[in-house]
Regions:
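Structured C-terminal subdomain patch of bacterial secreted/periplasmic proteins
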Residues: 137-138, 142-145, 152-154, 158, ...
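His/Asp/Glu-enriched short active-site or ligand-binding loop at hydrolase and phosphoryl-transfer sites
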Residues: 74-75, 197-218, 266
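A short, structured surface patch at a secondary-structure boundary
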Residues: 45-100, 104-110, 210
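Bacterial Sec-exported substrate-binding components of ABC uptake systems
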Residues: 4, 16-51, 150-181, 288-296
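Proline-aspartate-enriched helix->loop->beta-strand connector
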Residues: 93-107, 123, 222-236
Length: 296
């Protein structure tokens, strides 16, 4: 079951091009779901990133219930733990939904199969996923609208954009680029493509993503390919929680620059994969780590 859940999560962060936009006083997601662009008083949220954004901009009072995650907690941990949970990221207890009488339900694409059932019950539903950093910025703005915290949201969006532009400016001065990948699993060795949040993070950090040259939305990196590309670093996320898993996945790993220089590490999936404002701070941390690799 754990492998199935993480595989679904991987699809969520790679295959999809989910976006959310405001147009003609309506909020529209990539699936054609539309809601009025206004403040909602009673919101059920299954997207961890949106929950984190709501707390950051002071819109948490609009939350009546959430869907909790199974693998990692949602920030701020102590406050989110006190919220009522009526399901998880992929499924909601419909009887509980009726009980809380929401005027808006915000879900991720992992709940797509259940959206129609919820809509038939007469509820406003929107899919909130972002698959890029720009998408996260847009999500911050939309979250501000639905929670009545538009000013606070735009302030947060600007702060995140400043951080992103600072990173881009610093990277533009570099004369060379590191090569690497963020891995989802080691059996087989699957990496995040460019069309994903982790892939977009690498791009903005000025890293050459070795998975970009492998066809498909879920690039499988063969031992021969890894040896040929000779990455400067390899990072793990999702189902990976130890560098040892990566090192022992193939006998070619120790032969790469990443293996020889011990540049194999694990990233916090709740930060690097989640469509939350916190990813921009995590990029700063990752940038410093990559700078140390460059200066070795």
């Amino acid at each position: 079951m754990k492998k199935i859940i993480t595989f679904i999560c991987f699809i969520l962060f790679t295959v999809s091009s989910f976006a959310i936009k405001v147009e003609n006083n309506q909020i529209i997601d990539d699936y054609g779901n539309k809601i009025e662009a206004k403040e909602y008083k009673k919101i059920i949220v299954t997207d961890p990133g949106v929950i984190e954004i709501l707390f950051k901009i002071g819109g948490e009072k609009s939350i009546v219930a959430i869907g909790k995650t199974s693998r990692s907690k949602i920030y701020p941990y102590d406050k989110v733990d006190k919220l009522v949970s009526i399901g998880n990221i992929s499924n909601l207890n419909l009887e509980k939904v009726v009980e809380y009488k929401p005027d808006l339900i915000i879900v991720t694409s992992m709940m797509l199969r259940n959206i129609e059932a919820v809509k038939k019950m007469g509820y406003n539903v929107i899919v909130s996923n972002a698959s890029s950093l720009d998408g996260i910025l847009d999500l911050i703005s939309v979250t501000g609208i639905v929670s009545g915290k538009k000013v606070e949201a735009e302030k947060l969006r600007k702060e995140c954009l400043v951080k992103l532009e600072k990173i881009e400016k610093e990277n533009s001065k570099k004369t060379s680029k590191l090569k690497g990948a963020i891995l989802f699993s080691t059996s087989p060795m699957i990496a995040f493509s460019e069309d994903s949040i982790p892939g977009d993070v690498l791009k903005h950090l000025g890293v050459i993503n070795i998975a970009a040259n492998v066809p498909g939305q879920r690039p499988i990196l063969s031992p021969e390919y890894i040896l040929k590309e000779n990455p400067d670093f390899l990072a793990g996320a999702m189902s990976l929680d130890s560098p040892k898993q990566i090192i022992e996945a193939s006998n070619v790993i120790p032969k790469t620059k990443a293996g020889k220089n011990n540049n194999i590490f694990i990233l916090d999936s709740s930060l690097i994969l989640r469509s939350s404002y916190r990813i921009f701070d995590e990029m700063e941390v990752l940038k410093e780590k990559l700078n140390k690799i460059e200066n070795k």
